């Protein structure tokens, strides 16, 4: 395979993990970061100890503080940043791009102010003439396990399946299997909304409830995700795949999951401000819960679990009381509530 340069915007755990994969595949990953300390550590020590402790990076992984340097000559630009920074970074990217480039994003969330998915935010901020294609790379994955080269599967979703296949070819190897899909909306809805349900799974575990409760929460949570997804144009089958149920399972059941850990602390009685301070990293489900709360009402979509989690986060609702209210809802036929 011909060696290709790939720029990665974001020096966090996911951006760094993907850079490791690209280096393993004999490509030239260049990470753009905004902190001297992290950029220097990647270049000099070949580690990123804050985000991926104990991982030694291939020497081919490089980092820079210069966006122009990172994207110069890159076949693909991967955007691996928190959703709250997406607009700002994409404005910078739009100014810096000199020719049409394949853009890939791995950020999972909804913009609260607009209810826009991340690909829609990118499309607003990066001129169409500078976007050769826009691909969503998503699925059941923790950066820590990708960096350890544990078996992982993802899905590259794009309306242009040829572009999705290019991304597939750059990242696929014996440790990371990539599928392709043309349902961008479904991939983004599944990836974003599962973070809300993962908060709920953590809350359930923090309250001391068992596997029964979490299994029910995940299953009924997926019903809510599917209802909203179909309402905005997703293929319902997408939610049975990697970017749907796959991503939900890994995020609701793993100690690597920031959303599960945050929910677990909430379930044990800590308030949201305390939890976010202790986490020290972005918890996307909190921001997404705020967005989906208003979005579901606007679309008249029934999402009782999501609404309960919103109430716990932002209205100081007692978690046990929220569970009691969910369990006491009007009886239904299961098939009618999907």
Curated annotation (Swiss-Prot):
PROSITE patterns: NAD_G3PDH (PS00957). One of its GO terms (molecular function) is glycerol-3-phosphate dehydrogenase [NAD(P)+] activity. Its EC number is 1.1.1.94. Sn-glycerol 3-phosphate binds at residues 108, 139, 141, 194, 247, 257-259. It is found in: Cytoplasm. The keyword Lipid metabolism applies. The active site is at residue 194. The lineage of its organism: Bacteria, Bacillati, Bacillota, Bacilli, Bacillales. This is Glycerol-3-phosphate dehydrogenase [NAD(P)+]. It catalyses: sn-glycerol 3-phosphate + NAD(+) = dihydroxyacetone phosphate + NADH + H(+); sn-glycerol 3-phosphate + NADP(+) = dihydroxyacetone phosphate + NADPH + H(+). The keyword Nucleotide-binding applies. GO terms for biological process: carbohydrate metabolic process; glycerol-3-phosphate biosynthetic process; glycerol-3-phosphate catabolic process; glycerophospholipid metabolic process; phospholipid biosynthetic process. Catalyzes the reduction of the glycolytic intermediate dihydroxyacetone phosphate (DHAP) to sn-glycerol 3-phosphate (G3P), the key precursor for phospholipid synthesis. InterPro entries: 6-PGluconate_DH-like_C_sf, 6PGD_dom2, G3P_DH_NAD-dep, G3P_DH_NAD-dep_C, G3P_DH_NAD-dep_N, NAD(P)-bd_dom_sf. Keywords: Cytoplasm, Lipid biosynthesis, Lipid metabolism, NAD, NADP, Nucleotide-binding, Oxidoreductase, Phospholipid biosynthesis, Phospholipid metabolism. Pathway: Membrane lipid metabolism; glycerophospholipid metabolism. NCBIfam families: PRK00094.1-2, PRK00094.1-3, PRK00094.1-4. Disulfide bonds: none annotated. Belongs to the NAD-dependent glycerol-3-phosphate dehydrogenase family. GO terms for cellular component: cytosol.
